[in-house]
Amino acid sequence: MHNESPIKRRKSTRIYVGNVPVGDGAPIAVQSMTNTRTTDVEATVKQIKSLERVGVDIVRVSIPTMDAAEAFKLIKQQANVPLVADIHFDYRIALKVAEYGVDCLRINPGNIGNEARIREVVAAARDKNIPIRIGVNGGSLEKDIQEKYGEPTPEALLESAMRHVDILNRLNFDQFKISVKASDVFLAVGAYRLLAQEIEQPLHLGITEAGGARAGSVKSAIGLGILLSEGIGDTLRISLAADPVEEVKVGFDILKALRIRSRGINFIACPTCSRQEFDVIGTVNALEQRLEDLLTPMDVSIIGCVVNGPGEAEVSTLGVTGARTKSGFYEDGIRQKVRLDNADMIDQLEAKIRAKASMLDENKRIGISQLDK
């Protein structure tokens, strides 16, 4: 029930990664990356399926060898989302996966080789209608740029990116997006701000090597939150030393917090104190796990007492306000006659949320069908 995001997004051109539109106002796509051995086809496909279940839009797969490229051919046949091939050092691997139907090629300017090699990659991409991501990283800048600046700086990342933008422009190839990632929040933010002023191509956001699940999520939320709040960014990846599924969840949570893209339940819950009348923390944790399959956007407030409970419930799709024995229940901001038994809160609230989601989905379906008439 909260208002739409006030953020005005940066104008950018449109490309397609498989069937996913990127840029020019398209929904910001959430990406992740497999961390299996790509030559282990079964494990890699299993992980991609796990990412698909939590709503990933695009998955990147590392292709370090020709054996991995051959495995990618089998992986691509079993994936339901677009796959990006992550290519370093050997440009010939990019040429091979282009033959196997890759949806996007990620190349690193710092190690892909000279312009002649890039020309071959671009020729293959053009022939197969495959977009390219220029993936600049503060940890692998070209040697001459490292010597010029002494250390990674926003200007150094920008120079690396623009050097390869110029090559693609000379080759009359405009189907590309760019990233300028760094592990330092301020370095990455500064580089993206500079790049956003220079080009109109879509930007892929990320804080690279952000860290473990907790610290990495915080760093990514700060860095990407700053950029997204300024309208910068068309795709994103949360880089965590953790299960890639967590990357997708955190990515959607950041977009949800900024009201840029809503997917699933936005839980509004109090941190609890001695005034709580039911187990708020246990209720929220259980419902987050049980309702992971729901994609319907809605705000659900779960507040343990009447201090802030009614106010939050009045601006939520569904809301619970703690009271002794039985708690108040709100729907669309209106208090209902029915009250929820505190002893059975989780099951009751799950049923209410699923019923509301079904109703909202049906209303949306009817609205779409009427527009089609």
Swiss-Prot record:
Cofactor notes: Binds 1 [4Fe-4S] cluster.
Positions bound to [4Fe-4S] cluster: C270, C273, C305, E312
Keyword hit for Oxidoreductase: yes
Cofactor(s) needed by this chain: [4Fe-4S] cluster
InterPro entries referenced in this protein's UniProt entry, alphabetically: Dihydropteroate_synth-like_sf (IPR011005), Enolase-like_C_sf (IPR036849), IspG_bac (IPR016425), IspG_bac-typ (IPR004588), NO2/SO3_Rdtase_4Fe4S_sf (IPR045854)
EC number: 1.17.7.3
Keywords from the named record: 4Fe-4S, Iron, Iron-sulfur, Isoprene biosynthesis, Metal-binding, Oxidoreductase
Function (record text): Converts 2C-methyl-D-erythritol 2,4-cyclodiphosphate (ME-2,4cPP) into 1-hydroxy-2-methyl-2-(E)-butenyl 4-diphosphate.
Name this polypeptide is given: 4-hydroxy-3-methylbut-2-en-1-yl diphosphate synthase (flavodoxin)
Species name: Photorhabdus laumondii subsp. laumondii (strain DSM 15139 / CIP 105565 / TT01) (Photorhabdus luminescens subsp. laumondii)
